[in-house]
Amino acid sequence: MKKWTIDDSKELYNINGWGTSYFGINEQGNVYVTPCKDNTQIDIRDVMDELALRDVQSPVLLRFPDILDNRIEKTWSCFKKAAEEYEYKAENYVVFPIKVNQMRPVVEEIISHGRKFNLGIEAGSKPELHAVIAVQCQSDSIIICNGYKDQSYIELALLAQKMGKRIFIVVEKLNELEIIAHEAKKLGVKPNIGIRIKLASSGSGKWEESGGDASKFGLTSAELLEALDMLDKKDMRDCLRLIHFHIGSQITKIRRIQTALREASQFYVQLHKMGYNVDFVDCGGGLGVDYDGTRSPSSESSVNYSIQEYVNDCIYTFVDAANRNDIPHPNLITESGRSLAAHHSVLVIDVLETASLPEMPEEFEPDENSHQLVKDLYEIWDNLSPRNVLEDWHDAEQIREEVLDLFAHGIVDLKTRAEIEAMYWSVCHEIHALSKNLKHVPEELMNIDKLLADKYFCNFSLFQSLPDSWAIDQIFPIMPIQRLNERPTRNATIQDITCDSDGKIANFATNRHNSHSLPVHTLKKNENYYLGVFLVGAYQEILGDMHNLFGDTTAVHISVKDGQYHIDQIFDGETVEEVLEYVQYNPKKLVRQLEIWVAKSVKQGKITLEEGKEFLSNYRSGLYGYTYLE
């Protein structure tokens, strides 16, 4: 067997596919990140070792703001290139919807670096608008107001506009137009109104229903005409500045985007023909991320196009429509939050322990006292061959089921059941190995790897840190961050530490295809074994919940300066005290209640005074500790 190399690991985990030049494997066999154009490599294992010296324990979320900056620059440069190629004569604006990641340090970094790149912010709710207006105080960047709106939302937006903010209020429902008109007249403001149009076109992938006739938001063609009539009657025709459409997030197929763009461009043309001088088109979101690195339109975790191709289609479609109809090119807005934010965050978790299925030692042989079914299964195991692999599988299944039934009725003993189970799983392992060499693998054997996988128990909550993995079976790139110059000899599923059977990951992107298990190494004594979960910067932090009261993980900001990495900030993960307060417990009251109980127990002689003090000390220190295992 040839020696394992880091090139083998690169291929196995397809890091060159999903890493998009940000992630790789160094000569030490560790995963590195390259956040900047200067190609400075940050060894993630080195980072974890330094954090351990600072008493920072996993799980930890590593944020690389330089990657955010690079994604902004990359998207802007794609627009610049397309504008030159298609002689685009208007402005383009990249807008970050903060619902993608509302964490203050992330939003502030995007705003700060995005100022020179026409980067704006989108708010989809009243709380988001409150955040956006405040952090954008010193900027004249565009603010897009989406989502459902009431009178106070609209008043806040209009007053901000009156003070100089470039705000567009997008009408999602007809009744919002009435409120906008009323508040604008009251405040003496000429509003910048946008209208979200419900296209017939829809996206592809997990969020396909976000667009098309079944979409939640937007005005139909008939409602659009009604809105235009309302604007005319209120003498607000010139307030209509923008049209907006959105066909879904993470669109996997470029053809769906092209179809939607063509449809939307005709709305722009028709409005101009009707005398409405709309000068902005918001193309919404949808620019996807290649999570599995396959560039496959058939994978819901991938996309079959690049940022440049997406941008080219956006600009070309509207330039072509405008030129054909002799109308101005529109200013184009894209809300590509997932593409901007996904790559900048890496979740690092440590493996606590492992569990494997029992296997029969190779030297085992049944004796004269063994049950006949043990002898029968041993005969199958001893004579396995590729020719009869499916028949052997069926026979082994039948024997196991028969023994389980006999055990349930008290007919066979525990020793017989244990021998059958261990031998059955040994048979399964060998059948799986044999089936890999078959030209046509029987359908029943295709998922046998799912049955055989080890369980690697990791110190994290799936529901808190990777909610999309649980909720919609989103695939994220996952791999060990060390020992990648060694051959991984085990295959495992990942189990979290919640008391929930759903707290597991059993779908992985490996070797350019999806697998039910992840290739991993056996654990070494007294050595931490870390797994990295990549591309988690979009939606995961903010969607995470406190199942089993596991709180936010520690977040660490790492930047590159003068060719070296620097740990800029450490945001401590939530403590037990903090999560208890979320669910309306008063930690001080809890301590007082325990003090009374302990005093009573000491008085009754159930524990000593020293034991009582030790108990209260442990309880108090636990309240102020990390919600995860330390």
Residue spans for each PLM region:
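Charged, compositionally biased N-terminal leader segments and the immediate start
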Residues: M1-V31
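A non-catalytic, amphipathic alpha-helix used as a structural packing/dimerization or gating element
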Residues: D66-K74, E226, E263, D313
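Short glycine/threonine-rich loop-to-helix capping motif typified by GTGT followed
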Residues: I251-T259, D290-I307, S339-T354
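Charged (often Lys/Glu-rich) extended helix/loop segments that serve as interaction or gating elements
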Residues: D313, V319-E630
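Flexible, glycine/charged-enriched surface loops at secondary-structure junctions
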Residues: S58, L62, E84-K89, M274-V278, ...
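Low-complexity, highly charged intrinsically disordered N-terminal segments
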Residues: T20, I25-Q102
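Active-site-proximal beta-alpha core segment in soluble small-molecule metabolic enzymes
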Residues: E87-D282, L287-V289, N304-E309, T317, ...
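Short alpha-helical segments and helix-capping/turn motifs at coil-helix boundaries
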Residues: D7-S9, E73-K81, R104-E109, L129-H130, ...
